[in-house]
Swiss-Prot record:
InterPro entries: Enolpyruvate_Tfrase_dom (IPR001986), Enolpyruvate_Tfrase_sf (IPR036968), EPSP_synthase (IPR006264), EPSP_synthase_CS (IPR023193), RNA3'P_cycl/enolpyr_Trfase_a/b (IPR013792). 3-phosphoshikimate binds at residues 23-24, 28, 167, 169, 317, 344. It comes from Staphylococcus epidermidis (strain ATCC 12228 / FDA PCI 1200). It catalyses: 3-phosphoshikimate + phosphoenolpyruvate = 5-O-(1-carboxyvinyl)-3-phosphoshikimate + phosphate. PROSITE patterns: EPSP_SYNTHASE_1, EPSP_SYNTHASE_2. Keywords: Amino-acid biosynthesis, Aromatic amino acid biosynthesis, Cytoplasm, Transferase. Its EC number is 2.5.1.19. The keyword Amino-acid biosynthesis applies. This is 3-phosphoshikimate 1-carboxyvinyltransferase. Pathway: Metabolic intermediate biosynthesis; chorismate biosynthesis; chorismate from D-erythrose 4-phosphate and phosphoenolpyruvate: step 6/7. Catalyzes the transfer of the enolpyruvyl moiety of phosphoenolpyruvate (PEP) to the 5-hydroxyl of shikimate-3-phosphate (S3P) to produce enolpyruvyl shikimate-3-phosphate and inorganic phosphate. Pfam families: EPSP_synthase. Its main location: cytoplasm.
Amino acid sequence: MNNSEIININGPLKGEIEVPGDKSMTHRAIMLASLAKGISTIYEPLMGEDCRRTMDIFKLLGVTIEEQDNSIIINSPGYQNFITPHQVLYTGNSGTTTRLLAGLLSGLGIESVLSGDVSIGKRPMDRVMKPLLKMNANISGIDNNYTPLIIKPSTIKGINYQMEVASAQVKSAILLASLFSKEATTLTEFDVSRNHTETLFAHFNIPISIQGKTIQTIPYAIEHIQPRDFHVPGDISSAAFFIVAALITPGSDITIHNVGINPTRSGIIDIVKQMGGNIELSNVSKGAEPTASIHVKYTPNLNAVTIKGDLVPRAIDELPVIALLCTQASNSCIIKNAEELKVKETNRIDTTADMLNLLGFNLQPTHDGLIIHPSEFRSNATVDSQTDHRIGMMLAVASLLSSEPLKIEQFDAVNVSFPGFLPKLKLLENEGK
């Protein structure tokens, strides 16, 4: 990732769009469809770089995956007939692929090596390895914390585990490993994190019990899996950039259709409402993965908010662009209890503050979040995504607050989750003219 992009987009933004399929759900649907013997079709998946890494790995395990227009067809021999890979399983920049497959491959007992790019090599894996080792997984890494992760066959045991952090990736790694255990596994969450693994278990016929923050799988749950088709909703994390762009750009009025509004992911909607933002939902569908159309208009004089507690995991990936939104509030805003931001593609607490402060905004990083003061875009210094897709898109949205072009280094990082992000933003600009 080394290309730069000069962003020169001015408002207002107007029109109707859809965003790519949800990244979290696409990963999980690929994994579960690949485990189930037979044919599953995934409609409207995200075909970004991260999800392609997940597909590539299952191809190496013997799964046939065919891409068609807006869908992928997965023809699996079933988990019982996976082949042992004879090369390193490359996860690229995808923490989801790395951490979830650490659990799944441990459960499968397939000898394998997981390794990613330089960024993945710096991200902690002990949070996944510790519970997996308690489950009798044979998994090791550099300093028992970093990739490459070496996985060898073992017999997975069920555990009763209390989560220490609100992390959907850690939870999912445990649940995926537990599918192959002869004992039940009980997991209690610290705070409820995104529940796509649980909803997709049920969708693919895997028994799972959920009572509040406690989740339980049954012995040998994998034996119940069945192939299923799945329609992936639009990613609310991708929609977030357009929500904020419309809120901060005078005259803007946009609608984003078919966005997933799973309650464990819809924190940004609640935050915008607390700030007094002009946001409305329509065409709301019901079900395990509900969707809606989101209508957003420019809103001046936003209220100050404190974002903390169980709201944080419901908006964890949106917090960088929410921090930008908070610079336009009438008083200082606080984000706290967000330590998880430190172990994303970058330390997003520091990266968000550093990049926005370069542009003249006023953000103070803290040990677990940010203090964001009302401030304006005052400098067109060159900024850098730091190879973090969400930082790159957040900076592009920030450029709407300036009448001058903004140069963003390593902007191609956005392709990890949103190929075509910039053309879609320009489309709304053109509609607004």
